[in-house]
Regions:
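A nucleotide-sugar donor-handling region in carbohydrate enzymes
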Residues: 203-213
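Hydrophobic alpha-helical positions that pack around
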Residues: 229
Length: 357
C-alpha cells in the first residue's frame, strides 16, 4: 500500500494521461492512509478526482445491470414505487435498513449461471431473530420504503445520482420518527453515518447496537468451533469498529476466535471497491486472504459486510478445494446459535411418555 503510487494516480488523472482508468483501480480501502505517517486522507482525493473524470467509470464496472437498476431509483418517476411514510408500519423509535442484499443475491446467481447459493438476505431475518430474543422493538425500513443508500454511486464519482438518493432517503428517515437507524451492511452504515446529515438520528451498525443494548444470550456451540474474523474496510479502518464483532463472536461458549496475519487496522481488503473491481487484481487479494484464513486453521470465516461475503463466495464458486471454507456474516452466525439454543430448549421441554405395563 504505497501512498506515493496513489499520488501518481491522482496526478496522472489530473493531467488526463490515463483516461482515469488507474484512478478507478484504487480500492478506497484506506490502507495507505492508515500507513501514512502524515495521516493524509488519500481516499478523499481519489473521491474528488473521480467526479471529474469525463464519462464516469462505465468502462470499469462489471455489474452494469445491477448498477443501472440501483441508479434508476434516483429518478423522481421511481418515487411511486416506494411506500409513503404515512402508509408504512413504523411502530418503534429504532429502524433497521437491510441495504441491497437481495439485489446482490440475485446478481451473484445471475453472474455465476445460477450456480450460487449465497443468501445475504439471511442477515435481515437473522438481525430480527436477535432483536426478538433481546425483547427489543425495531421497525423494518425495507427497500419498499427507502432507496439504495448510494454508497457505490458516491465512490464511483456519480455525485448527481448519489445526491438524489441521499435527498430522498434523508427526508423519509427524518419524517419516520425514528431516532436510531441500524444496518448490518458496513457500507450502508458508513454512508448514513458519514455522508448523510440525519438530524436527530443516531446511525449504528448492528454489532454496535447489540453490544450497547447488552446482547448476551448465553449461547454455546454443540461442537467446539474455531473461527477467524475479517475486518471490512468500511467498518474497520473507516469507522473504527473492530472490537464489537469480535466481542459478540467470542461470547459464544465453545468458540475460539483466532486472528489472521493481517487483522484490525492492517486487515487486507476483499477487493470489492464499490463493485468496480471484479478483476484479477481483486481476485489476487482474495486468494491471499484465503491463504491467511487457511493458515489460522479456522473452520469458518466471519465478517460484517455483505460485499465482503459476496466477494469471498465469488472466489469459492471457482471450485478450488483450498477455498472451501464457510463464510458467514456475524449476525447470521449469532442467529444460528440462538435458533440452536431454542431448538435444544424445546427438545428438553418435551417429557417422554412412559409406557404402562
Amino acid at each position: 500500500f504505497n501512498a506515493g503510487d496513489k499520488l501518481n494516480i491522482i496526478y496522472n488523472s489530473w493531467n488526463n494521461e490515463d483516461d482515469g482508468v488507474p484512478l478507478y483501480s484504487c480500492l478506497t480501502c484506506t490502507a495507505c492512509t492508515n500507513a501514512c505517517p502524515q495521516l493524509v486522507d488519500y481516499d478523499s482525493y481519489v473521491d474528488i478526482r473521480r467526479t471529474l473524470i469525463v464519462g464516469g467509470p462505465a468502462a470499469e464496472i462489471p455489474h452494469t445491470v445491477l448498477q443501472a437498476v440501483l441508479a434508476a431509483e434516483a429518478e423522481e418517476d421511481s418515487d411511486a414505487d416506494f411506500v409513503a411514510v404515512e402508509d408504512y408500519p413504523i411502530d418503534s423509535n429504532v429502524g433497521y435498513y437491510p441495504g441491497c442484499v437481495d439485489y446482490l443475491d440475485q446478481e451473484m446467481v445471475f453472474s455465476h449461471l445460477n450456480e450460487g447459493d449465497m443468501n445475504l438476505g439471511d442477515t435481515t431475518s437473522a438481525a430480527f431473530t436477535l432483536f426478538e430474543e433481546m425483547g427489543t422493538e425495531v421497525s423494518y425500513l425495507g427497500r419498499d420504503f427507502l432507496k439504495c443508500c448510494g454508497h457505490d454511486q458516491k465512490w464511483q464519482g456519480l455525485d448527481e445520482v448519489f445526491d438524489k438518493l441521499k435527498a430522498y432517503n434523508q427526508k423519509k428517515i427524518e419524517a419516520s420518527g425514528i431516532d436510531t437507524l441500524v444496518s448490518s451492511c458496513a457500507e450502508c452504515f458508513r454512508t448514513f453515518a458519514r455522508d448523510y446529515e440525519l438530524e436527530g438520528v443516531k446511525v449504528m451498525h448492528t454489532t454496535e447496537y447489540l453490544i450497547e443494548n447488552g446482547f448476551d444470550m448465553e449461547m454455546k456451540v454443540e461442537d467446539e468451533l474455531t473461527v477467524t474474523y475479517h475486518d471490512p474496510c468500511r467498518l474497520g479502518r473507516q469507522m473504527g469498529i473492530y472490537e464489537e464483532p469480535r466481542q459478540l463472536v467470542a461470547g459464544v461458549e465453545g468458540v475460539e476466535l483466532v486472528e489472521m496475519e493481517h487483522h484490525g487496522e492492517d486487515a487486507m481488503c476483499c477487493g470489492v471497491s464499490s463493485m468496480m473491481s471484479c478483476n484479477e487484481n481483486a481476485r489476487a487479494l482474495r486468494v491471499s486472504r484465503m491463504e491467511e484464513i487457511r493458515n489460522t486453521g479456522a473452520d469458518m470465516m466471519i465478517t460484517s459486510c455483505p460485499k465482503c461475503v459476496s466477494h469471498f463466495e465469488c472466489l469459492k464458486f471457482e471450485g478450488d478445494e483450498r477455498h472451501d471454507i464457510e463464510i458467514l456474516d456475524v449476525v447470521s452466525f449469532l442467529a444460528r446459535q440462538v435458533e440452536a439454543k431454542k431448538s435444544l430448549a424445546e427438545e428438553s421441554a418435551v417429557t417422554p411418555v412412559s409406557a404402562e405395563a
